Amino acid sequence: TKSVVANQLIPINTALTLVMMKAEEVSPKGIPAEEIPRLVGMQVNRAVYLDETLMPDMVKNYE
């Protein structure tokens, strides 16, 4: 299963857009790639670096 990975540096409190995210096979696994449409508009609660895997605790109100 692919996970959501940052396609660029995403500053803290930024609302996610499609261009900021990509799907990749990573370990450890993060948020599943099929969640990308749901993540659009949600804010990150810390800076996320290029190629960093998005984990559930990095996205505000993600459950």
UniProtKB/Swiss-Prot annotation:
PROSITE patterns: AFP_LIKE. It is found in: Secreted. Keywords: Antifreeze protein, Secreted. Belongs to the type-III AFP family. InterPro entries: AFP_Neu5c_C, AFP_Neu5c_C_sf, Antifreeze_III, SAF. This is Ice-structuring protein AB2. Residues 3-62 form the AFP-like domain. The keyword Hydrolase does not apply. It comes from Pachycara brachycephalum (Antarctic eelpout). It comes from the Eukaryota. Contributes to protect fish blood from freezing at subzero sea water temperatures. Lowers the blood freezing point. Binds to nascent ice crystals and prevents further growth. The keyword NAD does not apply. GO terms for cellular component: extracellular region. Pfam families: SAF. Detected in blood serum (at protein level). The record marks Q8, N13, T17, Q43 as: Important for ice-binding.
